[in-house]
């Protein structure tokens, strides 16, 4: 279900629109614009998306069209939750 009004269209930064015409400029390109939508012209390109610290390499496929670039470069680390308490660890105050 689209969140943006249809009459507004999808948002794409101006420099990405210029690269849409010249596909060879988009290959392995650094992208800081996480808010831009992925267009069908970008399919089968490798881009590097900035996550706030480093650039994450990502291949654009047909399934990613219509989504934002920022959805594919996570900004937070995944830390698995610790469920069991080992024998040397304390439980905390009671």
Swiss-Prot record:
- BP terms from Gene Ontology: ribosomal small subunit assembly; translation
Q: Cite the Gene3D superfamilies for this sequence.
A: 30s Ribosomal Protein S19, Chain A
GO terms assigned for molecular function:
RNA binding; structural constituent of ribosome
Q: Report the sequence similarity comment from the record.
A: Belongs to the universal ribosomal protein uS19 family.
UniProt organism field: Petunia hybrida (Petunia)
Where it mainly occurs, coarsely classed, is mitochondrion
Q: Which UniProt keywords apply?
A: Mitochondrion, Ribonucleoprotein, Ribosomal protein
Give GO cellular component annotations, separated by semicolons: mitochondrial small ribosomal subunit
Determine the domain of life of the protein's source.
Eukaryota
Q: Which InterPro entries match?
A: Ribosomal_uS19, Ribosomal_uS19_bac-type, Ribosomal_uS19_CS, Ribosomal_uS19_SF
Protein name as it appears in the record:
Small ribosomal subunit protein uS19m
Q: Where in the cell is it found?
A: Mitochondrion
């Amino acid at each position: 279900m689209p969140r943006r009004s249809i009459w507004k269209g999808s948002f794409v930064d101006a420099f990405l629109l210029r690269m849409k015409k010249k596909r060879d400029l988009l290959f392995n390109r650094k992208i800081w614009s996480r808010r831009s939508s992925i267009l069908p012209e970008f399919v089968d390109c490798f881009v590097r998306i900035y996550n706030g610290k480093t650039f994450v390499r990502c291949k654009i496929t047909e399934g990613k069209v219509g989504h934002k670039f920022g959805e594919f470069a996570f900004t937070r680390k995944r830390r698995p939750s610790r469920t069991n308490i080992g024998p040397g660890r304390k439980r905390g105050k009671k």
